[in-house]
Each structure stands twice: as C-alpha cells, then as structure tokens.
C-alpha cells in the first residue's frame, strides 16, 4: 500500500482526492468541547474578559490506523504529530526529527543581501497555478493551494539520509482536493491542529489536519445571510481556535464561532454566522470587494480590513460594533500622495500588533500605527522594482518584525520578491531574484525565519538566509553556474 501511495505522489503535480463526500461529515464532538447550550449567537465569545484572555482547551483526537507506530511518551506539539502521522502513512523517512528550534538568523537583523534558495528548495506545480500559501505557526509545514481547489502540504526543512551535504530541502508530504473551485487563502490555527481555506465557491472550510477531513463549512452557496461572492480571505483568531473572520468580494465581513450551533444537511455540517457586516467599505454608494480582514495580534475583538476601491483601512471592534448599522472604531484618512484612489491588495501586522502594513496598487507599502489609525500613515516603503499590478500580490512580516516581504518584484525580465528592512528610518530594500520566471504573488514567513513564495510559473520557492556569503558567492558566478538558484541583490 505504501508503494502505491508513494508512486502516486512521485508524479509531480499529481493530486488525489482523499476526502470523499462521506468523509466530510462532522465527526462526533469530544466531551471536552461540548456545544454551547444557547442557540442565540452572542458576541461575548469574541470579547476579552476582565482584560485577561482565556484560551479554550481543546483535545486533539488523531485518527488511529494499524500502520501507525504506538505513541511515544514525550509530548509533542499538534503540528509535529500531524506531520509525522502523514509521513508514516506515506512510508517516508523519519531520519531527521522535526525541530521547532528558532533559527539563529531571523528576518531583517541580517543584511537583506544574504537570502538564497537552492534548486532543491524549488517545487513545481504542474498543470495548475498556486494561488495562496501559508506556514504553520510552530513548524516548517507549508500549505499551498491552487486554482483548481487542491491543497498540498510541504515540509520546507526535510532532511534526506542520502544527501551528502546534509542540507534541508523542500519536499511534498501530502495533498487532497479541498474545494471544487479556486482557493484564495489558507490559514493555520494557533496550535496548528486546524486549517481554514476560503474559495471562489462562496464558502470557507475548516479541516482537521490530523485526518484531513472537513469538520465544518463557513457559508452556504446561494443562501441569504452568508457570502454571496468569492471569499477572498479567512483567518483564525490568534488567541481562540474557535473564532474566525472572513471577507468576500460582495463587500461583507462575517465573524464565526465554531462553538455555536450549526446545521447538518446530507451529512455536511454548516456553521451559522455570529455577526455579518454588510457594505463594510461602501464607496460612493457602491459595494466594493473586501480584500483583507485580519485579527490584530493579542486581541480577540479587533479586526483590520481593506478594500479594492480605495486605500482606506478600517478597524472593527466587536465590543462596540452594532448589528443594525455597524461603524468602525477607526478609519485611515484618504491618501494625498496620488491624484486618484488605489485599492489595497493585502494587509498584515507586525508580531506585536503595533504596526499595520498595507500593500497598495500604487506599488507603495504604507505603514500605520494600530493605535493611531486616524492619524494616517507614518512611513512608506518604495522600490522601483516593486510593481503591485494585481490583487493577488500579498505581503508578510517576518517573525521578529524586522523584515517585510512582498511579491510583485520585476527587474528586466526577472520576477522576484522585494524585501524591506523595517528597523531603519530610510527605506532599505533588496530583491530576491533568479527564483521565478513569471510574476510572484503570495509570500509568507515560517516561525524559523524561512520565506516562501509562489509564482505564476507554477513554482513554489523556499528562501533561507546565511552569514556565510552564500548569496554573495552566487552573485559572482555566471548564469550557467547558478541556473535554478535564487539569491538577493540590492
């Protein structure tokens, strides 16, 4: 059986739908997580109680199969267990244990010119384009989703016994068909036990990573009260595995709580919304697409959102929002740097939540203070090679908050990622070149300081930083010697 599965996965880009309709039903609820007794949808589940955040406890139940080894006595994190379960099922090697140790070289504390990527850290998605990606919060587990609705898991630090250089490489672990339409975002819960996806089928799904089964759906196609267009983004609350927020092309933002009662139709479980904000970014009486809705770190009640019509960012506080006519707690003023409005493609925050970064269609990244949104932006990041030409271009902040990465880099006929140093007063930047041949769209950072990027050429690339001059040595070689390598340059 392991040989058959291994053969199936050896076909590059080949996917197999392992989530049949029968397996997508909601599993029995564990005794430690009973359903809420009240059928009313209340907002206090999102709020902070007495200034102290109480993280709900959740018992992770893993699928038991005869092929699995008996559990070890050392307690491991959910993501590590999930990865090992998947590799054991596929007959993979466990010669190098997965480590959660933080890299010594993280983010912008290194010179921006030290990033590089080897050929073994590039994977190709054949016959389908990667649309989004996301790293797990505690491990080197990378999820990549495509235009066909496929979801694939990669290990960005896989060690091979036969590799004489003993260098980690990127390896495909597992994959399944998550949606029958394009997937626009993917996000891990804080403990990495759950995975949420948003799709063009007007719904989002939440998967149990240990079984790869869909445990609930956020939305119902064609039903009032839910999203009526493509769901552009879905995100878990950092301090609660039950609370999520999603935004859609229809201009609405919906808050979800998986502890509330849902409905089951034909064996499929659908969650009911807790709060829906219609026309969240209404512009001149017309609806506009909500491009991003992100929780502020260390908060269970505040969400920052952006739209496609203008550069305005809005802060929503669930402690003060009203269901009849919701009003934002704060809004950024109109930009005066250009003669016309430019939409925002994506928003991210610094790890401490003090800074907010917005990637604008005018190819400028704006930095705001989360405490003073009404005062406008406090800093801009510019680079002549940065061209944010579509709403698929995303940005991400490193785990230490010192480096900002954004897709859309173009130099001559080469595409790449543009990185900025956020610790300096002046804008210091570099471009990661040589890794992709077509437009680079989404990027994300791992907890260990690795950077992943995807491109319209179908490639998934992992970047590392080094103090040993790896990138500098590559820049000194000719093109034939660095074919399929990527490196950073000023």
Swiss-Prot record:
Residues 18-40 are annotated as: Disordered. Pathway: Protein modification; protein ubiquitination. Keywords: Cell cycle, Cell division, Meiosis, Mitosis, Nucleus, Repeat, Ubl conjugation pathway, WD repeat. WD repeats lie at residues 178-208, 226-257, 285-317, 339-369, 387-419, 435-464. Its main location: nucleus. GO terms for molecular function: protein-containing complex binding; protein-macromolecule adaptor activity. It is found in: Nucleus. GO terms for cellular component: Cul4-RING E3 ubiquitin ligase complex; nucleus. GO terms for biological process: cell division; meiotic cell cycle; proteasome-mediated ubiquitin-dependent protein catabolic process; protein ubiquitination; regulation of double-strand break repair; ubiquitin-dependent protein catabolic process. Component of the DCX(DTL) E3 ubiquitin ligase complex, at least composed of cul4, ddb1, cdt2 and pip1. Belongs to the WD repeat cdt2 family. This is Cell division cycle protein cdt2. The lineage of its organism: Eukaryota, Fungi, Dikarya, Ascomycota, Taphrinomycotina.
């Amino acid at each position: 059986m392991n040989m058959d599965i291994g053969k199936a996965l050896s076909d590059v880009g080949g996917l197999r739908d392992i989530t049949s309709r029968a397996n997508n039903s909601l599993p029995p609820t564990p005794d430690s997580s009973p359903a809420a007794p009240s059928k009313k949808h209340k907002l206090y589940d999102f709020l902070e109680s007495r200034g102290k955040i109480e993280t709900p406890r959740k018992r992770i139940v893993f699928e038991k199969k005869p092929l699995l080894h008996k559990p070890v006595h050392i307690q491991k994190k959910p993501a590590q267990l999930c990865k090992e379960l998947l590799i054991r099922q596929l007959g993979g090697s466990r010669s190098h244990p997965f480590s959660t140790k933080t890299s010594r070289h993280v983010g912008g504390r290194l010179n921006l010119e030290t990033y590089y990527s080897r050929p073994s850290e590039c994977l190709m998605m054949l016959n389908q384009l990667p649309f989004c990606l996301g790293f797990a919060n505690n491990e080197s587990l990378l999820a990549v989703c495509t235009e066909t609705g496929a979801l694939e898991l990669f290990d960005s630090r896989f060690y091979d016994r036969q590799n004489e250089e003993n260098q980690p490489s990127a390896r495909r672990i597992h994959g399944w068909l998550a949606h029958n339409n394009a997937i626009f975002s993917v996000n891990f819960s804080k403990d990495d036990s759950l995975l949420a996806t948003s799709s063009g089928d007007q719904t989002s799904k939440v998967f149990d990573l240990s079984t790869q089964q869909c445990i609930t759906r956020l939305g119902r196609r064609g039903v009032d009260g839910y999203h009526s267009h493509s769901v552009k983004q879905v995100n878990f609350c950092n301090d609660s595995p039950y609370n999520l927020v999603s935004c859609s092309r229809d201009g609405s933002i919906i808050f979800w709580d998986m502890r509330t009662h849902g409905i089951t139709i034909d064996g499929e479980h659908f969650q009911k919304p807790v709060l829906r904000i219609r026309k969240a970014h209404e512009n001149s009486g017309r609806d506009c697409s909500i491009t991003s809705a992100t929780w502020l770190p260390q908060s269970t009640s505040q969400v920052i959102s952006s739209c496609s019509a203008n550069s305005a960012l809005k802060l929503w506080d669930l402690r003060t929002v009203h269901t009849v006519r919701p009003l934002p707690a704060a809004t950024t003023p109109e930009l005066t740097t250009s003669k016309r409005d430019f939409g925002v493609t994506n928003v991210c925050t610094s790890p401490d939540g003090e800074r907010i970064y917005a990637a604008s269609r005018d190819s400028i990244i704006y930095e705001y203070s989360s405490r003073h949104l009404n005062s406008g932006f406090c800093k801009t990041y510019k680079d002549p090679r940065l061209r944010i030409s579509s709403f698929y271009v995303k940005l991400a902040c490193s785990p230490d908050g010192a480096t900002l990465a954004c897709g859309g880099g173009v130099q001559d006929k080469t595409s790449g990622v543009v990185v900025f140093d956020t610790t300096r007063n002046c804008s210091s930047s570099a471009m990661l070149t040589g890794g992709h041949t077509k437009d680079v769209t989404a990027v994300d950072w791992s907890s260990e300081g690795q950077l992943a990027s995807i491109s319209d050429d179908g490639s998934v690339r992992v970047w590392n930083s080094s103090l040993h001059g790896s990138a500098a040595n590559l820049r000194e070689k000719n093109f034939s010697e660095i074919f399929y390598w990527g490196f950073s340059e000023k």
